[in-house]
Amino acid sequence: MVRLKDIALQAHVSSATVSRILNRDDSLSVTEETRERVLRIAEELGYQPSAKRRKPRGYGRDSAPLIGVVSCLSPEEERQDPYFSAIRKGVEDECFKQEIFITSSIHLGSFQEHIFHELDGVIVIGSLHDEALTSISGTFKHAVFINSTPNPARHDSVSADFYAAAQQAIEHLLSLGYERLGYIGGQEKEHTVKNGVNSKRTIEDKRLTAFLKTARPQPDHVKIGEYSMHEGYRLMKESIAGGTLPDAFFIASDSMAIGALKALQEAGLQVPRDTAIVSFNGIEEAEFASTPLTTVKVYTEEMGRTGVKLLLDRVNGRTIPLTVTLPTSLIVRQSCGS
């Protein structure tokens, strides 16, 4: 059994500090780096807190439910991805508000190494392939999926309509008079586990589907890599080297767009004078990019909070599965020229 002392030794803090961080004591004055280090070590060690909990506000059970969080991303991937880290923050904030401690927080690759029989339910962040979905469904009575909608006749889910949101962004560019549009994006992945190894497969990316249907681009104006800032930089350099630059780009994540901006600046090109950009996700950094980004705002923290509420409703007796699709907003800034 992992003790607070074990976490404290690895994190180089006191056991009291570990306890207060794990219990979300907002009166504790520590750096964000220390807090994240303690939470990461606790997760990596598989720390299991006491099952004694206070009843969440507004729910009828005598004790609070025991819930877990399963992330399809590795710890490193999640830390580097503002989109998914914001979803987790929403989950954690709502659990704190409801006075619930997340009993288990694990990543898909280590799923089979944990014991879950005492949990009332889990929140799954990300997209699962059939095998992993079957494993989750067979292990937990209640599961809520965030950022995917598997089997809506059985499971609750929270997501955003990426197709409609992307279409709105592309139509905004077209309405401004841009005719030749380019696309920079990554690959949408589904996750599964085989023999304890986390593997992925590429699935349809609704943002790309919307772009191809709405913009009807030239094939060489569509650049696909991985969802990262570095890949956005690389793919924009590739576009610049190709000769004729599109009038405007729809870039499928803010992080990729920030990388793309750097490539354009290095080439002496200005946004939106030489090419315009609309991106996706609405992370905080988009507002403070070298050219503030017009972006589709996805309410990721609210997705996390809603997932917790749905799970509590399920545990409290609701039997009808709910599919929640949150709205998005187009935040217009300097990068699109309007």
Describe each PLM feature range.
Residues 116-125, 182-185, 222-223, 243-253, ...:
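Periplasmic-binding protein-like
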